[in-house]
Amino acid sequence: MHNIIKSTLSMSPVIPVLTIDKVKNVEYLFEALICGNLKVVEITLRTSCALKVIEIASKKFSSLKVGAGTVISDKDLNSVKDAGATFAVSPGFTLPLATHAIEIDFPYLPGISNSSDIMNLTNLGYKFFKFFPAQASGGIEYLKSLNGPFPEIMFCPTGGINQENASKWLSQKNVICVGGSWIIPAQMNDYKEIQKRALYASRLAS
């Protein structure tokens, strides 16, 4: 389970975080991301069609690793697994949810914002975390400070990350990738622009 998270997060320097409110033409979004060489996506459970979008992405785009975001309960976790998601992501965590992910052997990236969160989750075997909200929780300087007591822990900072500052985040030795919504802002349907942004993002760590 944890090895799958590691290999998945290593596939793309930037994970687009998408909140999609309609199913129509959603395939074009994923095609644009793939053409832009981004292979991992997070689809948040913030809309009524999110599970359907996850199902479409999982079934039609075998080269894409489909993450489900805003997973906050056992029910959510079971639902995204059934929909075909590759992994689940939370803005925070609860010990019951983190334990349930282990019990059903489903790759899970819990959200953390402080040392106590990390200590609770490492006791369960977790080593990869979503640092959220990254900018509001202390930014790069705080993330740097976590490397001292937790040298084996890796993070996917999300929240306040954009095209201008993503490279600086990615240069930190305890950052495996970053998450961001700037690649596909809400209501954007310019697929050439999405592909262009995705291609730029895919090269940030090179």
Residue ranges and their predicted role:
Residues 94-127, 132-137:
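Histidine/lysine/aspartate-rich catalytic loop segments that bind and position anionic ligands
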Residues 141-162:
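Shared catalytic-loop signature of beta/alpha-barrel
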